[in-house]
């Protein structure tokens, strides 16, 4: 069985770091992308023991991943849904603070690709 290729949006945040650590210790997933609003510094890759072939841009991450896990901001969702549909990439949304326009967008996106919305996944 092949491993699920995942990318993490919001990699520089607390939940992003937790997801990276979980992905690196899970034999069922392959971490193919990490990206954030700000560029990912190479020292972040080394510090987190991420392989050098992991992509650090949104575009490459959506192209290579089966699923992108999003822990960024509601504003970013508009760009992510477009990239998910054009690359047939599934979306797991953990971002909080979405409004009706975001939910309508997610519903529309779910007609073209996989969407899972689960806010408030943080510890304690």
Question: Where in this protein do the model-derived segments appear?
Answer:
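Short glycine-/small-residue-rich Rossmann-like dinucleotide-binding loops
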Residues: 72-73, 96
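Rossmann-fold NAD(P)-binding glycine/threonine-rich loop
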Residues: 82, 86, 95-117
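NAD(P)-binding Rossmann-fold cofactor-contacting core
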Residues: 25-47
């Amino acid at each position: 069985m092949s491993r699920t290729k995942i990318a993490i949006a919001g990699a520089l945040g607390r939940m992003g770091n937790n997801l990276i650590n979980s992905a690196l210790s899970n034999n069922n997933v392959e971490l193919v992308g990490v990206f954030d609003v700000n560029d990912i510094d190479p020292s972040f890759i080394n510090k987190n023991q991420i392989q050098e072939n992991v992509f650090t841009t949104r575009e490459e991450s959506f192209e290579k991943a089966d699923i992108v896990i999003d822990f960024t901001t509601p504003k970013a969702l508009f760009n992510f849904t477009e990239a998910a549909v054009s690359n047939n990439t599934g979306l797991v949304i953990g971002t909080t603070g979405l409004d009706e326009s975001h939910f309508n967008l997610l519903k529309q996106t779910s007609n073209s690709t996989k969407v899972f919305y689960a806010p408030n996944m943080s510890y304690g």
